[in-house]
């Protein structure tokens, strides 16, 4: 939970406070490399999350994909992209630890298994947990009217003027996140 909530945000904070203000030419020079790494992170993290049978690994791989979108926003060199990256980082800092808590602390303590297929029918036995898990999964998916959606939209819209291909490849995270969340 600490990794998803805090440690991943240290890199974002470091890029915002140190790298972009002190080395703006280097950021613009290496932005194609960073954008490529962000797209690879989005696609690889999402496809790996689709194949997971372990709930905690699924949440971890979704975090990798979301941080790829944050990198796309940070290195878009636009105000909209950077604002979207900040918003997505904050939203991810609330949603991802909540999912880790629900999977690790609540379900694993009761069933001693993290295999997804063993969790069928939990709505009958744990209705409050199911409602909370549904809420945070919908937020993690980036559905409209959630902060994750606004952050993803701003990040990808910030990348679009500079590099439409990267923005479209990054937008695959929207479809793939729906696939692994369902």
Region spans (language model):
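Hydrophobic transmembrane alpha-helices and their helix-loop junctions in integral membrane proteins
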Residues: 1-153, 157-182
């Amino acid at each position: 939970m600490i990794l998803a909530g805090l440690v991943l945000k240290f890199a974002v904070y470091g890029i915002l406070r140190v790298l972009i203000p002190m080395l703006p030419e280097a950021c613009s020079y290496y932005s194609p490399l960073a954008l490529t790494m962000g797209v690879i992170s989005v696609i690889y993290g999402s496809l790996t999350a689709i194949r997971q049978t372990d709930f905690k690994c699924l949440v971890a791989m979704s975090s990798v994909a979301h941080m790829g979108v944050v990198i796309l926003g940070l290195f878009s060199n636009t105000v909209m992209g950077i604002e979207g990256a900040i918003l997505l980082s904050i939203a991810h800092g609330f949603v991802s630890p909540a999912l880790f808590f629900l999977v690790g602390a609540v379900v694993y303590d009761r069933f001693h298994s993290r295999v997804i297929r063993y969790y069928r029918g939990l709505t009958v036995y744990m209705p409050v947990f199911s409602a909370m898990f549904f809420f945070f999964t919908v937020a993690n998916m980036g559905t409209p009217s959630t902060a994750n959606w606004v952050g993803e939209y701003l990040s990808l819209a910030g990348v679009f003027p500079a590099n439409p291909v990267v923005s479209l490849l990054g937008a695959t995270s929207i479809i793939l996140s729906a696939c692994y969340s369902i």
